[in-house]
């Protein structure tokens, strides 16, 4: 595996740090960073402990899955149109009948479906980016990633700027026990290759990946961390799991280990007599997902494709993990006072089974509906009227909503894009939370039909059916930018690579009926929203994105 097994150039000192558990380094660096944070961070500077009591305050769980499509959670019956999906191209190893695919999706999430039925489904909910790093950064900050120069995973690879406040810090400063479990993907990282005899053709197995000290979760609002710092990790035997700053061994299947950790967080908060704020970021169903899930999950599925069965088994492992967490909350007396906010970090990739993103156009890494319109809900037993909420909302609203529920004020100088949804959900406010949502992102075909040949050959390589690692012509860095703006009626999409502008009704999930020519005034107004957004955002952090960003600005200038 020439590209995947290429060793990182790292210093001997980094290797020694890793081997020794990084203890001495971490202790010194942590003290230094914490001191700086208390002096510079808005969340710290505005906090006075005597102003707030945690008594009776709700527990918070922000729950994410990785690359789960809108159609892979039976979230919206409108996204399960067999006629729309039956002719969809898919990667060979995932080919199954559409009826079996829908059945598998329905069987994989009984617990999540129950929570949705008891809570509020955000049927017009979007994440702030089509790929993981920027999307997760937006959840943490309540701000569009462009505000701090992040337009792609490449921009995020040196860590989310330390000038940005992560909203969990506000919970921590107000007496909450805060924990992050699972995927982090918000740090500047280093990779240390594992011994060659331990390496495989799954690149997740081949490096120990760890965060630079400044970007450690414990320096961004969390009392406790257990998980991985990279974009993904192996489902078994991960070499990159950390508990706080110490590398720890993998124990069985990754979903089960993360669930065990989450239950530990719930129990510690109970012992400490503190409310908790848990960010629980499962790895599933992120690819590569070839290693078989445990039999207790596998036996639920019989689609005719072992690969598809395993995919949905990984989804089911998360669902059953959530079930275990709910049971522990009930046992501890925490169940009735816990809020759960759920989303996928972005849409599904073409390297997965139907229903993928359902009837929607697009995939991960794009701002078509399939890339950013994700299954999203809020559950707070007895506190919210169950049903669908169809106004435009964003995952950037998650932490502002949770902070509002906890009666924690947000410093005004944070300038958030996210808002608390509670006034609308509790019928205290009319109208809609957002007039518009805007995206400026890299636009790649990495995860759509155009790249099926790469994914077919990738599976052959991983399974030792070929010794040639396939060339990927559609990476993020090789792709141009696009912009998208949505209001509560329309979606306006422009892509630089084909100079295409489209205006579509939000109800046109396939974006087949381009209304731009017939609605020039709507187009003009929505382009004005994008210009204002750019003017209040930062240029890309990475050099590779500078020209692409300028191309977007040029296109908007020429459209005046």
What are these regions (language model features)?
Residues 35, 152-157, 161-169, 173-177, ...:
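Formylglycine-dependent
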Residues 1-26:
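Gram-negative bacterial Sec-dependent N-terminal signal peptides
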Residues 200-211, 215-218, 223, 348-358, ...:
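C-terminal cap/loop subdomain of S1 sulfatases and analogous C-terminal strand-loop tails that border
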Residues 35-37, 70-166, 170-180, 189-199, ...:
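Active-site segment of extracytoplasmic enzymes that catalyze sulfate/phosphate-ester chemistry
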Residues 56-61, 117-123, 172-179, 220-224, ...:
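Loop/turn elements at helix/coil->beta-strand transitions in domains of secreted/extracellular proteins
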């Amino acid at each position: 595996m020439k590209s995947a097994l290429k060793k990182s150039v790292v210093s001997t000192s980094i290797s020694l740090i890793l081997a020794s558990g990084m203890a001495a380094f971490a202790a010194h660096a942590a003290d230094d960073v914490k001191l700086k944070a208390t002096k510079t961070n808005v969340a710290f500077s505005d906090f006075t402990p005597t102003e707030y009591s945690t008594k009776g305050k709700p527990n918070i769980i922000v729950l994410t899955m990785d690359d789960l499509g809108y159609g892979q959670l039976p979230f919206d019956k409108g996204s399960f149109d067999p006629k729309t999906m039956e002719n969809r191209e898919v990667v060979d190893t995932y080919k199954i009948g559409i009826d079996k695919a829908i059945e598998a999706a329905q069987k994989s999430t009984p617990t999540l479906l129950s929570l949705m039925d008891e809570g509020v489904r955000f049927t017009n909910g979007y994440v702030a980016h089509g790929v993981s790093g920027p999307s997760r950064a937006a959840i943490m900050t309540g701000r569009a990633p462009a505000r701090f120069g992040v337009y792609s995973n490449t921009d995020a690879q040196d860590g989310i700027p330390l000038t940005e406040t992560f909203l969990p810090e506000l919970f921590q400063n107000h007496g909450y026990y805060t924990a992050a479990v699972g995927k982090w993907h918000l740090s500047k990282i280093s990779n240390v290759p594992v011994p060659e005899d331990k390496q495989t053709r799954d690149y997740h197995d081949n490096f120990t990946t760890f965060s630079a000290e400044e970007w450690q979760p414990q320096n961004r609002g969390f009392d406790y961390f257990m998980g991985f710092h990279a974009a993904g990790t192996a489902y078994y035997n991960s070499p990159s799991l950390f508990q706080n700053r110490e590398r720890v061994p993998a124990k069985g299947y990754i979903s089960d280990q993360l669930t065990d950790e989450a239950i530990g967080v719930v129990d510690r908060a109970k012992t400490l007599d503190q409310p908790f704020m848990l960010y629980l970021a499962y790895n599933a169903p992120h690819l590569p997902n070839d290693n078989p899930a445990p039999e207790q999950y596998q036996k639920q599925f019989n689609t005719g494709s072992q690969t598809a069965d395993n995919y949905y088994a990984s989804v089911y492992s998360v669902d059953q993990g959530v079930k275990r967490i709910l049971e522990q909350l009930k046992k501890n007396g925490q169940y009735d006072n816990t809020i759960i906010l759920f989303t996928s970090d972005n849409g599904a990739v073409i390297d997965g089974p139907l229903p993928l993103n359902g009837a929607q156009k697009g995939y991960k890494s794009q701002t078509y509906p399939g890339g950013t319109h994700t299954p999203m809900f809020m559950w707070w037993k007895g506190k919210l009227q169950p049903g669908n909420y169809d106004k435009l909302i964003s995952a950037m609203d998650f932490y502002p909503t949770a902070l509002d529920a906890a009666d924690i004020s947000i410093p005004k100088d944070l300038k958030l894009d996210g808002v608390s949804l509670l006034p609308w959900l509790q019928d205290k406010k009319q109208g809609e939370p957002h007039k518009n949502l805007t995206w400026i992102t890299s636009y790649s075909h990495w995860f759509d039909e155009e790249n099926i040949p790469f994914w077919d050959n990738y599976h052959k390589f991983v399974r030792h059916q070929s010794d040639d690692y396939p060339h990927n012509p559609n990476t993020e860095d090789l792709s141009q930018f696009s912009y998208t703006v949505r209001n509560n009626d329309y979606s306006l999409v422009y892509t630089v690579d084909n100079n295409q502008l489209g205006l579509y009704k939000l109800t046109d999930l396939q974006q087949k009926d381009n209304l731009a020519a017939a609605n020039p005034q709507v187009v003009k107004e929505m382009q004005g929203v994008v210009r204002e957004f750019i003017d209040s955002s930062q240029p890309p952090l990475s050099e590779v994105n500078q020209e692409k960003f300028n191309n977007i600005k040029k296109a908007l200038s020429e459209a005046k």
